[in-house]
Amino acid sequence: MKTQVAKKEEVTRDWYLVDVDNKVLGRVATEIANVLRGKNKPTFTPSVDTGDFVIVVNAEKIALTGRKLADKVYYSHSSYPGGLKEITAGKLLDKKPEELLKKAVKGMLPKNKLARHMLKKLKIYSGGAHPHAAQNPKNLNI
């Protein structure tokens, strides 16, 4: 019996809706990363993007445990001398709550070209409303 390898043309994609109200950031991000990758499907193939679309609502109400709101720091550098920028998780949650969840999920995806395609299937909204009602998303309980 040969191993089944998924082909890009044969992949069917579903839409899932995740409400992250009072859910822990890391636990939610791992589940979302698995769905984006397609690891929840029996047709999972590491070299093919078999994942589904994920819609995340209420991103501003996500929870972080411990003192991570004050202690967790995200760094970026502009490649110029003195160009190091840092922002705490608390400030990022106030300013751009979508970016906080996106950074967490991106860190859990593979570091290759396929990850950029997977990340495009992630739709994050800070409020409770989203414009994807026509896709009839299924609820994903986490």
UniProtKB/Swiss-Prot annotation:
It comes from the Bacteria. This protein is one of the early assembly proteins of the 50S ribosomal subunit, although it is not seen to bind rRNA by itself. It is important during the early stages of 50S assembly. The lineage of its organism: Bacteria, Pseudomonadati, Thermodesulfobacteriota, Desulfuromonadia, Geobacterales. It comes from Geobacter sp. (strain M21). Pfam families: Ribosomal_L13. Part of the 50S ribosomal subunit. One of its GO terms (cellular component) is cytosolic large ribosomal subunit. GO terms for biological process: negative regulation of translation; translation. The keyword Ribosomal protein applies. PANTHER family: LARGE RIBOSOMAL SUBUNIT PROTEIN UL13M, RIBOSOMAL PROTEIN L13. Keywords: Ribonucleoprotein, Ribosomal protein. This is Large ribosomal subunit protein uL13. Belongs to the universal ribosomal protein uL13 family. SUPFAM superfamilies: Ribosomal protein L13. The keyword Acetylation does not apply.
